[in-house]
C-alpha cells in the first residue's frame, strides 16, 4: 500500500461545512501517519437562474437566484492500512459529497 495515493474531492453548497469536513479528514490522515497534500480550493461553480417576478406581465421585472458549489481537493500520500480504516469509519456531514480515487504513484 506504500506506493499508492488517495485523491479525495469534496463538494458542498455550504463552505463552512466543507471546510469542517476537510479539516476532519486531514486530522485523521495525519494522526495515522500519512502525508497530506492540500486542501486545495478548486474553483467555485456558480449557477444563476433568472425568473420573471410576475406570472402575467412586466417582462422587465425579474429576479435572480444563484447556487454556489464549493469544491476542495486533498491528496493523501503513502497511506497505511490504518489510514484507510480510519477514513472509512469517519462520519462526515450529510451536505458534503465525497469522491475518492485510489491510484498508484
From Swiss-Prot:
Keyword Amino-acid biosynthesis: no
Keywords: Ribonucleoprotein, Ribosomal protein
GO biological process: translation
UniProt key word Ribosomal protein: yes
GO cellular component, one term: ribosome
GO molecular function: structural constituent of ribosome; tRNA binding
Chain's role: Involved in the binding of tRNA to the ribosomes.
Oligomeric form and interacting partners: Part of the 30S ribosomal subunit.
HAMAP family assigned: Ribosomal_uS10 (MF_00508)
Family: Belongs to the universal ribosomal protein uS10 family.
Entry-linked NCBIfam families: PRK00596.1, rpsJ_bact
Name assigned to this protein: Small ribosomal subunit protein uS10
Lineage, top ranks: Bacteria, Pseudomonadati, Bdellovibrionota, Bdellovibrionia, Bdellovibrionales
Amino acid at each position: 500500500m506504500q506506493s499508492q495515493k488517495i485523491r479525495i474531492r469534496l463538494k458542498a453548497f455550504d463552505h463552512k461545512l466543507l471546510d469542517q469536513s476537510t479539516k476532519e479528514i486531514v486530522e485523521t490522515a495525519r494522526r495515522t501517519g500519512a502525508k497530506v497534500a492540500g486542501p486545495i480550493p478548486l474553483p467555485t461553480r456558480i449557477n444563476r437562474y433568472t425568473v420573471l417576478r410576475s406570472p402575467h406581465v412586466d417582462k422587465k421585472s425579474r429576479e435572480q437566484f444563484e447556487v454556489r458549489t464549493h469544491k476542495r481537493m486533498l491528496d493523501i500520500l503513502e497511506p497505511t492500512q490504518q489510514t484507510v480504516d480510519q477514513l472509512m469509519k469517519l462520519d462526515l456531514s450529510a451536505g458534503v459529497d465525497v469522491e475518492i480515487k485510489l491510484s498508484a504513484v
